[in-house]
Amino acid sequence: MARINESERGATPFQHLLGHNQEVMNRWNDLGSMLAEEGRLSSRLKEQVRRTLAQGNGCEYCKAKGKPEPHLFDEKTSISVGFADVFLKVKGDIPDSILKVLKETFSDEEISELCAFIAFTTASQYFGAMMGLKA
């Protein structure tokens, strides 16, 4: 059971917790949906990054959606997942050498999208962890 009562708003247990504030839930959902869809980076790549982050961000609900699937990785996915692993260890203090590796494969637009996705996904997973959200 979560640490607070679920609201009646939302379609998922996560949304039920955010649903205590309808506007926050709606905007959170909109941003999450936009970041997860196809953009400069594929939704498949982002799902593998999300799964990687879930293993380190403490949200049991998020972990239950699956571990990364290395057999599905292409080069960009491998680099993105590696970057997410570095982020989990050092948080925002990413060394320039790591960004240099990203710049060898990704455009500035792709790096911006990847970092935004990682930051938003981490915030979502931290919220789930703080609320004690279970699978």
At which residue positions do the language-model features occur?
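Hydrophobic alpha-helical segments
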Residues: 1-135
